[in-house]
């Protein structure tokens, strides 16, 4: 992610000093334009703490630049404050769900349009509160500098983990994998299973069969440009899914 600034030599020199020991960010100058580039680490929106937000790096550095005007520093400071954590506290929603745990808030997009700056957040909050509850708290917390708007909302989804179908799925997994101690888990992924009455979402790979290549952090994961699938683990998952359909189909 990059930012272009019309700046004086003093600003460039200040930025160079500020970035001297940080290889995540670089600065370049051409004529009267200064370009600041930050490199983050990609992560799934359900697990933002696994990544590094490039905008957060930029905002933290630029918000402290004394050679930027006071208004610009204030804007970057407000951005930095919003991106201070991934658990919702910076947005005024430090909430936790009994089943899913702490809320997550992932900033994925920043843009300027018609002279106004906007940041988009993917907020995932489980089943104990509603979208309206979350939005109201964000509005109250940020109203001094920002206008909060809900673009798209989906309430949490959870089926009974102790239901008969869940027990059958777990029984099959334990039998095929040989792991008698395996337990189901919940995650913040937005599954299509929510659109069906009695659909439990399960994985598409059996990780115990996966021999993952060693990749740098931020590579190879879900939805990333270099996402990979372990064939052996995928074929093992087909066995599990087939056995699950047979098990759940009996006496249905």
Predicted region positions:
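Midchain, well-structured core segments that form catalytic/ion-binding scaffolds
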Residues: 1-128
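A short small-residue
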Residues: 36-44, 147-152, 217-225
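A generic structural signal for short coil/turn motifs at secondary-structure boundaries
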Residues: 44-48, 156-160, 211
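Generic non-transmembrane alpha-helical segments
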Residues: 14-23, 57-68, 137-146, 164, ...
